[in-house]
From Swiss-Prot:
Spans traversing the lipid bilayer: 12-29
Gene it is expressed from: GAL3ST2
Pfam families attached to this UniProt entry: Gal-3-0_sulfotr (PF06990)
Cytoplasmic domain ranges by topology: 1-11
Cited function: Transfers a sulfate group to the hydroxyl group at C3 of non-reducing beta-galactosyl residues. Acts both on type 1 (Gal-beta-1,3-GlcNAc) and type 2 (Gal-beta-1,4-GlcNAc) chains with similar efficiency.
Protein name: Galactose-3-O-sulfotransferase 2
Stated family: Belongs to the galactose-3-O-sulfotransferase family.
Amino acid sequence: MLSALGGLQRCFWAILLLALTVSLLAGFLHKDVRLLMPLLKGQAEGPPITNVMFLKTHKTASSTVLNILFRFAETHNLSVALPAGQRVHLGYPWLFLARYVEGVEEGGPEQRFNIMCNHLRFNLPEVRKVMPNDTFYFSILRNPVFQLESSFIYYKGYVPAFRDVVSLEAFLASPGTYYNESQGLRNAYARNGMWFDLGFDNNAPAEDAYVRARLADVERRFQLVLIAEHFDESMVLLRHLLRWRLDDVVSFPLNLRSPGSVTSLTPEGQERAKRWCALDWRLYQHFNRTFWARLRTELGPRRLRSEVAQLQARQRELQALCVQDGAPKNKSQITDLRLRPYQSGEADILGYSLRPGLDNQTVQLCQRMVTPELQYTARLYTQQFPEKPPKNIPFLGA
């Protein structure tokens, strides 16, 4: 009995001594531990996620995200679900079908790819036929006022609703005069385009129960929805969730318009745009809220500011290293056709030229960062399917 009591006393004093030691160490090291926590949090908690599906919405900075994903695929030797044949999109504006992917045949063996990011209209059952079960799904949204303005300039000659109207302001003053649902899928660019890209009816009434149900559908399917107006914060959060390196998400803005081809709506025009694209407006408002809530939960304000600053510093460093004159150029100034962006509608799309005199390794790094979407799609297609005829990009001969 006495022996047992002695053992208990020794155990008690050992625990007390340990508690005092921990308390003293915490007092001395409190400041240093707090300083180290951001670094410890930045450590990847596992291998990088390599199965990724990005729903590339229109006029939302999505071409820059596509470049990030293409670069990651190329540097890690991953397979990409690329458009079949001479297509440069995955069947858009029709709902996606698996057969729109090169290498997938109806009735043939199953094909699975690591990355999917070219334009498509979302159709989950068909996407699942070509992507693994553990795929990370994400997308990006933009304020529909500015998304619609960009669509108007970019698709002016293509969209029936835009073709005969002098300005977006005039269109929004009387949209029913120009917009006709019966004119087909091309008009999807003129109303609730992001809603349409998600696979929903862009002409549906914005009734509360319907909208809430569709928002819940998006939340169930997509692990993350980014916001174009906060692109750097979006990339920090994406990097965190995918467990990627900083350089994996550093980018230069692609498919960027010159300031002269950007128009501003009046306050009244902006309100009309929100009403006309009411589904997109509800979509954007909802996921803008969830985006910031996710940032607070995953990172917190201090770590977010720190990582955004790191991202921006690295972008400036690479821009100074890679880009001739450190700034984007218009089409006529870009002599390398591999880097010349596609021009559409009334938009003046800017691109980049590389600084001369770069060594081969740096040229490869920089060229990947500034290669436009169509040329990059064509290059990856040739790499993955060398036995197929290469994709023809007609405007490169212009």
